[in-house]
């Protein structure tokens, strides 16, 4: 497996108050991921891995094929964007992980997704 600095990942998260029920320890977040291919060759996203940690340190691992039902091909200079969600039991938590990808020659590589916060805007820790 090769390491590729040619794919860039950015994530924005937002608290979904209308779907959350804090009294039931249910905090819903949406996150939008933008994956940019900065390289010269097309790439394809095959799978994902997430480590979701709530404010109490409880961890959940999620892995699977593709994202939002797709295994997108991303041409050089192009980007793929999708929105998904996470539900945790505390008003603050984190997510991190990686994407399993392959280039046009069939070389597999991972793209890390650095830690990002899931936080209710009014919550101060």
Swiss-Prot record:
GO terms for biological process: error-free translesion synthesis. InterPro entries: ApaG_domain (IPR007474), ApaG_sf (IPR036767), Uncharacterised_ApaG (IPR023065). Residues 1-125 form the ApaG domain. It comes from the Bacteria. NCBIfam families: PRK05461.1. This is Protein ApaG. It comes from Enterobacter sp. (strain 638). The lineage of its organism: Bacteria, Pseudomonadati, Pseudomonadota, Gammaproteobacteria, Enterobacterales.
């Amino acid at each position: 497996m090769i390491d590729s600095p040619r794919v860039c990942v950015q994530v924005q998260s937002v608290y979904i108050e209308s779907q959350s029920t804090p009294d039931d320890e249910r905090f819903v977040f949406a996150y939008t991921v933008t994956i940019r291919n900065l390289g010269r060759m097309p790439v394809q996203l095959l799978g994902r891995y997430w480590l979701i940690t709530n404010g109490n340190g409880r961890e959940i691992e999620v892995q699977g094929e593709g994202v939002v039902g797709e295994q997108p091909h991303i041409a050089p200079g192009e980007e793929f964007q999708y929105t998904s969600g996470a539900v945790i039991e505390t008003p603050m938590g984190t997510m991190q992980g990686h994407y399993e990808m392959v280039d046009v020659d069939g070389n597999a590589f991972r793209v890390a997704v650095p830690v990002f916060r899931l936080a209710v805007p009014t919550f101060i820790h």
